[in-house]
C-alpha cells in the first residue's frame, strides 16, 4: 500500500468534491493526520454546522455522521465504514423513550449524543461529554431523564445534585473495562502522574481522577498543565493529539484494552473510497431530522 499516493488522491478528491474531512480523537493516527478538523463530539458538531463545503467525510462512528447530517441536512455526509457502529448507542431505542415518557410525563429527556437519530428526535435536548453538566444545569426542568450512558449520567448527577435525575442503564463497553484496581496499580507505577479520565468511566474510577472531561478537555488540560506525566483513562486514539501537542510530556494509558474497535474501522483507503464513490452516504427520514435537529440546536443554545 502506497500511503503517500493515497493521501495525494484524498487531497485531490477533496478539491474536486468541495469536501472536508472531520475526525474524532479516537481515530487511527493516519486519519487524524489527514483530517481538516480533529476533536470531540461537541467540537465536530459545531464544525459541521458552520462549514460551507458540500461534502462532509465523517471519520468516526455512525451516530456522529448522523449528527452531522442532522445539523447540515443540505450537505452530503459520508461515513467511510458503514458498519462503524456504537454499542452504547444501540442500548436505547425510540420505543424505550416512548415508554419513559409515558411512565414519567413530568420529566424532560436529556440525551447523550452517543445515540441513534430516532432517539434524539424524541428527546428535549442533546448533550456531549464536554457540556452535559452545563446542559442539565441550564435546562428549565428540574426533573430529568438522562440517557443512554449511566456513567456520564452519574457524573452529571453528582455535579447537579439539586435536580431529580433518572438514569438509563447504558454504558460504553470500552470505558467500562477500567476498574478501581487498574487505577490503583497505575498510580502506584506512576506516582507523579495526574489521572485524567473520561466521564464514561465507572463512578469509582471518576472519583479517583485529578481531572474528568471529554477528549478535547483532556487534551487541553494536559497541554496547559505544568505536570509532566499523565495517566489517561480513555480510548488510546487520544494519544496522537496528546503527544503531538506535548512532545516533552509522558502519557500512560490506564488499561491496555482501551481500544474502540468501531472507531478503528476507518482507514485511509476507506476515506479515499468514500470520496471516490460517494459512500457511504447518510440519509435520515425528514421527520426524524426535524425533531433531532431541534434537540441539537437546543444543545448549542444552552451551551
Swiss-Prot record:
Functional summary from the UniProt entry: Catalyzes the condensation of iminoaspartate with dihydroxyacetone phosphate to form quinolinate.
Source domain of life: Bacteria
PANTHER family with a match to the protein in the record: QUINOLINATE SYNTHASE, CHLOROPLASTIC, QUINOLINATE SYNTHETASE A
Entry keyword 4Fe-4S: yes
Encoding gene (name): nadA
Cofactor note: Binds 1 [4Fe-4S] cluster per subunit.
GO cellular component: cytosol
Protein name: Quinolinate synthase
Cofactors demanded by this protein: [4Fe-4S] cluster
Cellular compartments annotated: Cytoplasm
The entry's keywords: 4Fe-4S, Cytoplasm, Iron, Iron-sulfur, Metal-binding, Pyridine nucleotide biosynthesis, Transferase
Catalytic activity: iminosuccinate + dihydroxyacetone phosphate = quinolinate + phosphate + 2 H2O + H(+)
Amino acid at each position: 500500500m502506497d500511503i503517500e499516493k493515497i493521501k495525494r488522491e484524498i487531497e485531490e478528491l477533496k478539491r474536486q468534491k468541495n469536501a472536508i474531512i472531520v475526525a474524532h480523537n479516537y481515530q487511527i493516527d493516519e486519519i487524524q493526520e489527514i483530517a481538516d478538523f480533529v476533536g470531540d463530539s461537541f467540537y465536530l458538531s459545531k464544525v459541521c454546522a458552520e462549514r460551507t463545503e458540500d461534502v462532509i467525510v465523517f471519520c468516526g462512528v455512525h451516530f456522529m455522521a448522523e449528527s452531522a447530517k442532522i445539523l447540515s441536512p443540505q450537505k452530503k455526509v459520508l461515513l467511510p465504514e458503514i458498519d462503524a457502529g456504537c454499542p452504547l448507542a444501540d442500548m436505547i431505542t425510540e420505543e424505550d423513550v416512548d415508554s419513559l415518557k409515558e411512565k414519567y410525563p413530568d420529566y424532560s429527556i436529556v440525551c447523550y449524543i452517543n445515540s441513534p437519530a430516532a432517539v434524539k428526535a424524541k428527546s428535549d435536548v442533546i448533550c456531549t461529554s464536554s457540556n452535559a453538566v452545563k446542559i442539565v444545569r441550564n435546562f428549565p426542568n428540574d426533573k430529568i431523564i438522562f440517557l443512554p450512558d449511566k456513567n456520564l449520567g452519574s457524573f452529571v448527577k453528582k455535579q447537579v445534585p439539586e435536580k431529580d435525575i433518572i438514569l438509563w442503564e447504558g454504558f460504553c463497553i470500552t470505558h467500562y473495562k477500567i476498574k478501581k484496581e487498574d487505577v490503583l496499580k497505575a498510580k502506584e507505577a506512576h506516582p507523579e502522574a495526574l489521572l485524567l479520565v473520561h466521564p464514561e468511566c465507572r463512578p469509582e474510577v471518576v472519583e479517583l481522577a485529578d481531572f474528568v472531561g471529554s477528549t478535547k478537555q483532556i487534551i487541553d488540560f494536559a497541554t496547559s498543565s505544568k505536570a509532566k506525566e499523565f495517566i489517561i483513562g480513555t480510548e488510546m486514539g487520544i494519544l496522537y493529539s496528546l503527544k503531538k501537542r506535548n512532545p516533552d510530556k509522558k502519557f500512560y494509558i490506564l488499561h491496555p484494552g482501551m481500544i474502540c474497535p468501531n472507531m478503528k474501522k476507518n482507514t485511509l483507503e476507506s476515506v479515499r473510497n468514500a470520496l471516490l464513490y460517494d459512500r457511504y452516504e447518510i440519509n435520515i427520514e425528514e421527520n426524524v431530522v426535524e425533531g433531532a435537529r431541534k434537540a441539537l440546536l437546543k444543545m448549542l443554545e444552552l451551551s
